[in-house]
Amino acid sequence: MAVVDISEELKSLSSTMGSIEAVLDLDALRADIAALEEQAAAPSLWDDPEAAQKITSKLSHLQAEVRKAETLRGRIDDLEVLFELAADEGDADAQAEAEAELESVRKALDEMEVRTLLSGEYDAREALVTIRAEAGGVDAADFAEKLQRMYLRWAEQHNYKTEVYETAYAEEAGIKSTTFAVQVPYAYGTLSVEQGTHRLVRISPFDNQGRRQTSFAGVEVLPVVEQTDHIEIDESELRVDVYRSSGPGGQGVNTTDSAVRLTHLPTGIVVSCQNERSQIQNKASAMNVLQAKLLERRRQEEQAKMNALKGDGGNSWGNQMRSYVLHPYQMVKDLRTEFEMGNPEAVFNGEIDGFVEAGIRWRKQSEK
């Protein structure tokens, strides 16, 4: 790469980083960190474990964000020195090393730029993810379980905390549905682009004749409700059912009636939780899910009114958005962004950052 090209490239990278720093408002983030550190140092912090967990989690996330931005700025500043040294020494290996670092910085900058696109009203929230097996019988149930594993592995790779609230196992294999939380800031803004119907095409391992089977699973992503949302639920409007938790094949995993199912009578919304140790904990988790669903219902009603005013029919969350083809060829393709990967196994193992980043950019472009 010519010296002039390198100089212009480095100026462009520095300018892009400057724009990202302005959007992130690092000074404001540092002030937030200082305030949270003060709260975290309070002797009474763990008097309320749930509040303490939120404070420490948010503090850790903000510290990581600032550290990531500062590190990337340092790498960009160091690039000029790397290329100058390579040129002065006339060393091909040093030049190759500098160019590899340049490519790595480009990629890191692209990833950080995506974070600045998460500016929606609820984007900074934690996320509640629900996956349901749809058409396709046992293959759909197996597919739903693959998607659950995919998202949990993705979260694990990013060191994001997750909590599975409920999993309804299918009789033969897989799951009927599952609900879990991704407990990190901006989880909702990030994962909401995964909402929709996912399609799997493969030779069914459950078909004795080895025929190709198409199956579907639905992914719903909701923001976790906070006190400022004012989602109040009257206990008189709830029907509470308790039952024993069950595992794969209907096998009981608890000897007491600790699982809880809540039915919101005015709307007919039903949620359940069985993964906590006690009935009280399961009810609290189920209430969190119910609040999120009621918030989403309110948002959809408000959006419907806006769409009616604009003459826009809107998009249903059930629209097909991604295909996972394992036969006759191997390809995972997002039908909205055209982003694709030829390694479905890697995708099912949690390597979905490319799809998520492309989805966030596509959504931002669609809003213009």
From Swiss-Prot:
InterPro entries for this protein: PCRF, Pep_chain_release_fac_I, Pep_chain_release_fac_I_sf, PrfB
The keyword Protein biosynthesis belongs to this UniProt entry's keyword annotation: yes
Post-translation changes: Methylated by PrmC. Methylation increases the termination efficiency of RF2.
Gene3D superfamilies (UniProt xref): 3.30.160.20, 3.30.70.1660, Release factor (1.20.58.410)
Highest taxon, organism lineage: Bacteria
A Pfam family recorded for this sequence: PCRF
Any GO MF annotation of the entry: translation release factor activity, codon specific
Main location group: cytoplasm
Sequence intervals crossing the membrane: none
Keywords (A to Z) from UniProt: Cytoplasm, Methylation, Protein biosynthesis
N5-methylglutamine: residues carrying this PTM: 251
Cell compartments where the protein resides: Cytoplasm
SMART domains: PCRF
Gene Ontology CC entries for this record: cytoplasm
Similarity field: Belongs to the prokaryotic/mitochondrial release factor family.
Record function comment: Peptide chain release factor 2 directs the termination of translation in response to the peptide chain termination codons UGA and UAA.
Protein name: Peptide chain release factor 2
